[in-house]
Amino acid sequence: MTTIMHRAVRTATLAALVVVSPLVAQDRPDPYAAPYMESMTWTEIRDAIAGGKKVAIIPTGGTEQNGPHMVMGKHNYIVTFAAGVLAQRLGNALIAPTLQYVPEGDYNRPNWGDKPGVISLPDPAYEKVLDAAVRSLKVHGFTDIILIGDSGPNQRGMTSIAKALNAEWGGAGVRVHALTDYYEQGRILIRDYLNKTYGWSEQMVGSHAGTSDTSQLLYVFSQGIRKDKMAPNGGSPDAGVQGDPTKASPEIGKIAIDFKVNAAIKQFKAAMP
């Protein structure tokens, strides 16, 4: 295939994805306004619920090392933004404040927990916070409470709490949804897309702070990227990077977030009666 033809195929693929789920500039969520609850008054939230916004989204992120080129709050910025996109597409949702402390493993975990700035919650503590947040929102009149997590360790606790509360509240008219496909299916779709479109291997894309993660933060919060520090695998074995962030772009980030949000919506709709 010639270079021109390859570029044409790549452009067509990108265009098709954008048509499926457009994210034009005016659709970018504003975290300092509704439907983000921390930017609303209690009376505005009350009136929104009374007006039919009875879905609550609880995003979970993380405070972890992301190499020399990317800020610690990567997951928080991405999942807060993605929750806004999810709320837009559902049309009847409000967003709780993002939980920024999540399980990150042992405090002294080599090349991870021992890096300055990493904050880790034990699984039981994380689950207690989720449990309390969901119970609080139930009291206020939300009928469907969504949990989405931007990091792998978040998924287990989300699933556990959703299962326990759904069993406890069976028949009460309130459902808790752990939308793990946002993370689990989302990352598979992103990886496959990058392989088919650019020919990039899974190793090149990486599993942490590589092409996908860096692209998403470039799209959501470009100030969180230190471009002069980007290097394949962070430039050293102890950098905390798996993959090649130099391949990242905001365009890829936009597509990646679309994949994740679409996977979450599909899972949510499949669970509805």
Language-model region placement:
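Generic marker of residues within folded, mature protein domains
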Residues: H6, A15-L17, D47, S207
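Bacterial N-terminal signal peptides that target proteins for export
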Residues: M1-T13
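Extended, histidine- and acidic-residue-enriched regions that form the cofactor-binding/catalytic faces
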Residues: Q26-I146, D150-P273
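Bacterial N-terminal signal peptides
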Residues: T11-P22
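Generic secretory/membrane-interface signal
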Residues: I4, V20-S21, S207, D238
